[in-house]
Amino acid sequence: KSDVRRMGIGVRHAGDDGASAYRIPGLVTTNNGTLLGVYDIRYNSSVDLQEMVDIGVSRSTDKGQTWEPMRVAMTFGETGGLPHAQNGVGDPSILVDEKTNTIWIVAAWTHGMGNGRAWWNSMPGMSADSTAQLMLVKSEDDGKTWSQPINITPQVKDPSWYFLLQGPGRGITMKDGTLVFPIQFIDSTRIPNAGIMYSKDRGTTWHLHNLARTNTTEAQVAEIEPGVLMLNMRDNRGGSRAVATTRDLGKTWYEHPSSRSALQEPVCMASLIHVDAKDNITGKDLLIFSNPNTTKGRNHITIKVSTDGGMTWPLSNQVTLDEDESWGYSCLSMIDKETVGIFYESSVAHMTFQAVKLTDLVK
């Protein structure tokens, strides 16, 4: 209901810690119940890479009511004799290995490229001098400290691709323990395509098979039943989300019946999570989705719930959080069995956190 006013918490604002802007939220809940919000620290301006950008993390141990001082999880400083603004790293995606509580962040590091946009200036090849690098960091202490970056570009990038990067937001641990991050790549014909990458050995080695759909970019992944992954994609065709499923970790993909019809979008990042019936108060298997619920502009940030595997998203199962214009990116994570958290780019703070009761969402 639009007449309900919900309290949000501004976690990051323009100017905090001397940074011009904060963008690209990711959110996870660790095995200990800690909330970790991740984002770009865009020091000089709000523009995308290449720029002076690091990966920041905000941590909450009280279900999002208060947040610890920002930590820098990934930075490349003056690597290779180039200034910090020529070593930006951005668009983070974060996951919790639910078997070990190791937390992984994947981000794209760009080296050189002047001040051109990486989307157009990353080139085919494998080296940092030619193409963006896919970098991981991990935390073994619930998000307090982070490892040195690990370069997995050689494991997963095709040399003919112009740009390989993650799908910003979050990844998942599958029921069988497989770690999965959404990815996107600009292929040799300069068409972007969404997909996934996965690890079967707790994050040491990563694999990437086939694209889910052409001309798609930022995606989020959910395990809708054991071994079955759903990828919900930003589609450059506009108007509506693309949705595909795979049973073999991305070797083969099938268009979902809801694709390009059930969820409207203005061509923007969105969030999707699956919650098992046993893990939430409703006793139903839930898919929870958030995005700007519009086809024009980025406004009306809305959380929607489907109880039929993503086929329908009834109006009764929707809550609008922010009607005004913003950058519009969001990420969802369950806080406890009764509550979903959302970390999003709002009209009032660059990184806003809100907690919404499932009883308000599932009627």
Task: Give the label of every model feature segment.
Residues K1-K363:
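Asp-box/BNR beta-propeller blade signature and adjacent active/binding-site loops
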